[in-house]
Amino acid sequence: AYMFWQLMHAEEPYLTDDLSEEMKVARTTTIGDLNRLRKVIEKYDLKIKGKANTGLALCGDEYKIRLFILENIYEQLYLNFPLGQIIREKLYDFQERLSMDALGFGFFYRFFVVMIQRMESGHTIKKLEPKYEELYGSSAYMIVDEFLNEIEQVKGYKISKEERLFLSISVAGMRTPANTAEIEQKISISEGVADLIIEILDRIKAELNVTVVANELFDDF
């Protein structure tokens, strides 16, 4: 987790010797860890390019980087991420307003934290695949759009459409009580988006050792 964190924030190629020194391990251990990391991130179309003696760089789509974080190392990196009291209050107000259960809110919260941290470190989503673009204008998008308008006022910077779409993924298809006025009971999403959400939930289930019943979180597609 530490190695990925350093590489994803590096503004220039990272020397293997520097990683070894920071992690307080032998160079051979670092190289072995790098090789294992390369294999893990390969399925996300992410690569660690460069050479040990000239510097290494993490290459790949920002969305895929976030997906890897959410599915694999969120707890190690963001467990105590400082959001500030005002932002936390707005998040909990959002949960209460939509009558979100703990699991559903936890899913949304993770997406939000990763989005904020990546944006504030200068790493924004420039483009998403067409299957995610279809969320634009959906109920999920409108809910997130309104919420992020409030966050913009607190943060003092603009949040792009692409970032709003990213956060919408965490809301799309979520089941809420029929009497919740601010979200439609049924949100139509594509099979691709649904598969993505289910895959991430499976990862969260494995990390937290809790059972997730898919039909409690998703509407029929």
Model-inferred region functions:
Residues A1-F221:
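A cross-family "folded-core" feature that marks the main globular domain of proteins
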